[in-house]
Curated annotation (Swiss-Prot):
Family: Belongs to the universal ribosomal protein uL6 family.
Keyword Acetylation part of the UniProt annotation: no
Gene: rplF
Protein name as catalogued: Large ribosomal subunit protein uL6
Subunit composition and interactions: Part of the 50S ribosomal subunit.
RNA-binding listed as a keyword: yes
A cellular component term, taken from the record's GO annotations: cytosolic large ribosomal subunit
An example Gene Ontology molecular-function term: rRNA binding
Amino acid sequence: MSRVAKAPVAIPAGVEVTLNEQTITVKGTKGSLTRVINADVSVVVEDNEIKCSSVEGVKTAAQAGTARALINNMVVGVTAGFEKKLQLIGVGYRAKIAGKGVDLTLGFSHPLVHELPDGVTAECPSQTEIVLKGTDKQLIGQVAAEIRGYRPPEPYKGKGVRYADEQVRRKEAKKK
């Protein structure tokens, strides 16, 4: 069995977990999440704990660890939630919230509007910062990657959209 899958997922107070064949639903104070679990993994809910184990074979042991990590992210998401911070670095690079989307000015001839999917909210503490919040870790990471993809940080001046905890490796300019 996977080392990750050996540890059970604790169910905190106020969280309700329902298991219907291979579909698991987790409901909490911040909302509810549903996910289909791989058929090679057996999931058992007992004594305020969720236990994952592989059905048989070595190749399915990795799937049990993945399922346990995904279920843990669901439990954390509906209780505490997740957030991802983006920074806009560059002259004239700005962001503002416009309805159900983020209005981005990133040095193009036109402003970009990135529509946010359901389950993700954004706020701009300053013009050069975006904070994405929600319950689904995968969805927040996907939206952050899409916004970063409009203008990824370049290695010479460091301009672009980057994650708050990202280190951009700088290059030296070509010399004559």
